UniProtKB/Swiss-Prot annotation:
Its EC number is 2.1.1.228. This is tRNA (guanine-N(1)-)-methyltransferase. Keywords: Cytoplasm, Methyltransferase, S-adenosyl-L-methionine, Transferase, tRNA processing. GO terms for cellular component: cytosol. The keyword Acyltransferase does not apply.
Length: 254
């Protein structure tokens, strides 16, 4: 099938624990999208490329010190196997605390590459020479250490996949997502109307869609101003948003 792209988004994952990926491939909207082939997630396990009788995948660090690194041979072989089937122009992304912080913009930008090969480190990581020669980008979920890159890889697969066309139904559309307009989300309410002696805000029962839209925008701006004012610095405000923030600052003395 030359030139006919089967899936919208293609992920290759290099991991010693391929079973972990079932957490995203077997559940929810991403799981459904995989079943419908709009997403593809393939895994390669370096252990399958180990050449010794013990199938060794770790190796000692030069310079000594605690911990091990991923053994170069099996890792390189697994990476080459993934590259041989990845769509042309795929990017190799290494998940590590030393990487660029993932945010919605980075997730959205990942949609525009043909595929992502996600390299999941274990132990203390991988040989720097492999990073230099094979890794296009290093990404991080944040400033904390996990025992492996798999959870970070799954977060990327989920956050990118849900932005792909056709993955979310119209009633779960990603456009309305809070971080899609880089504001925090407004409060949400569902049945019953009175719950724990608290009522649902009247505007949400009014059926007045313009008033509801306005209220939700005000609530998002209030919440962003209170909890993440930094998000407002890097964002252009519409005329309406700027006016709401003025009111909030006066009213709320934030
Ligand atoms: N913050 C993150 O995104 C992250 C990614 C991976 C990870 N652990 C695996 C690993 C350990 C050391 C060196 C390279 C990879 N921990 C946290």
């Amino acid at each position: 099938l030359i030139g006919i792209r089967i899936s919208e988004v293609w992920f290759g994952v290099i991991t010693l624990f391929p079973e972990m990926l079932k957490s995203v491939t077997d559940f929810g909207v991403v799981g459904k999208a995989i079943k419908q082939s709009s997403i593809e997630v393939c895994t390669w396990n370096p252990r399958d490329y180990a050449t010794d009788n013990y199938r060794t995948v770790d190796d000692r660090p030069y310079g000594g010190g605690p911990g091990m690194l991923m053994k170069v041979g099996p890792l390189e072989a697994a990476l080459n196997a993934a590259k041989s089937v990845a769509p042309a122009g795929s990017k190799v992304v290494y998940l590590s605390p030393q990487g660029r912080r993932l945010d919605q913009a980075l997730a959205r930008s990942a949609l525009s590459v043909p595929g992502l090969i996600l390299l999941c480190g274990r132990y203390e990581g991988i040989d720097e020479r492999l990073i230099e020669d094979e890794v296009d980008e290093e990404w991080s979920l944040g400033d904390f250490v996990l025992s492996g890159g798999e959870i970070a890889a799954m977060a990327i697969i989920d956050s990118v996949s849900r932005l792909a066309p056709g993955v979310l139904g119209h009633n779960e559309s990603a456009e309305q997502d809070s971080f899609e307009n880089s504001l925090l989300d407004c409060p949400h309410y569902t049945r019953p109307e009175i719950y724990r002696d608290k009522r649902v805000p009247e505007v949400l029962l009014s059926g007045n869609h313009e008033k509801i839209r306005r209220w939700r925008l005000e609530q998002s701006l209030l919440r962003t101003l209170q909890r993440r004012p930094d998000l407002l610095e890097q964002r252009e405000l519409s005329e309406e948003e700027a006016q709401i923030i003025q009111e909030l600052r006066r009213g709320q003395l934030i």
